[in-house]
Amino acid sequence: MKKLFLTIFSFITVMLYSQKVDSNKIYTASYYAYNTTRYTASGQKFNNYGLTAAHKTLPFGTKVKVTNVNNGKSVVVTINDRGPFKKTPDFKYYSRVLDLAKGAFLKIASAGAGVIKIKYEILE
C-alpha cells in the first residue's frame, strides 16, 4: 500500500511539473500593484516590488523565466498568486498568461507599457 501511494504521488508530481509551454508562442503579461496590504493566494504578503507573478494553474513556488519579446530583457519570477483574470480584446490573438508584480514588470518594461508581449519558460 505504501509503495502504491508513493508511486501515485510521484506520478502526480511529475505531471504537475512537466506542464509544457510552447517557447515559440507569444503570450501577453501585465503587472499589478496595490496601495494597501494584500495577501496572495498562496498566503504570502504581496510585495509590489517583488519578483513574483500570478498564473492560473502553475503550482506556487514555480520559477518562471519571462522574456519581453520587444526588447529581449528577461526576469525570473516565482509564482505565488492566481490570475490573470482580465479579458483582453485588444490582444485577441495572444493569451494573457501572467500578471507580474510591478517590480518584476519594471525589470523588463516601463510601467507605461501596461501590457507586453512575452515568451516564458518554466525553470523549476
Language model segments and positions:
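Secreted/periplasmic proteins
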Residues: Y17-E124
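Positively charged n-region of N-terminal signal peptides that target proteins for export
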Residues: M1-L4
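Hydrophobic h-region of N-terminal signal peptides that target proteins for export
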Residues: F9-S18
